[in-house]
Amino acid sequence: MPYNLKRLAGYLLGFVLFYAPFALFQRALGYLLTHTNYVQTIHSLCLRIPIEHILDGNIFRYSPVSVVSTIMLLLAAFCFGPVFCGRLCPAGALTELLSRLVPDRFKISWRSYTEIAPIRYGMLAGFCLVPFVDGILACTYCNFFLFDLLVNYATRGYFISLSSSLILTAFLWLVVFGLFTKGGRGFCNFLCPVGAAQSLVYALGCRLGFSWQMQVDKQKCIGCGKCAKACPMEAATVQEKQAQQAQLCSNNCIVCGVCAHSCPVQAISYGRKHDEK
């Protein structure tokens, strides 16, 4: 199967698994854990609330489906990288697709202006600390919820009035960090706590040599920069000081495989660190 069709199939699978009107994952896990039929929306899965309460000790007070799903998500990220983001999440895929509608000269390369990782993890830290001041952000700027609303409107004609925070979120997600961002995944890079939490455990797994990861064969790499140009997360760079060789940043790599597909000499692969040539 051609690579682009594989990616599309993965995101369609994610849509069927997690979003209305199907939500097969929530239905199956909900029935397994509680023997009840869960509402088929992204709310019953919510990965953001358990992450928000991971520091204050209230993580297990919420829906068992939500808590178990979050634990599964982080374990998968530790072992295999942020595969949910890179291969299943249709909310991220939508803005990546939208960005292709705008010529490159009109798009912002955020890496050219700032380091992504400090902002990414800083937002995650703030997100997890908010409960200590009796606040909650999980539902305030949720692009998953917005995607669910778009799907409900398209399939059922159902919509709700949006709060000012959700209107701002939609503008940032779809326009600023979507249409006019290189790769279309600016929201994923800077504002998504689910992606940042996965990246944190993935980066730890990479440093321990445990996680499967995208890796560069230094003997094959010719420093052409095609991977850096293609990467939707701007996680791939070519460092002149490193003999013009590509480097992949585990702090925001989502193991989507775009870099490997774009490499003309097949210098990038996915596997355990000890498999690196």
Name the predicted role of every residue range:
Residues 1-242, 246, 251-254, 258-277:
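Non-ligating segments of multi-cofactor redox enzymes
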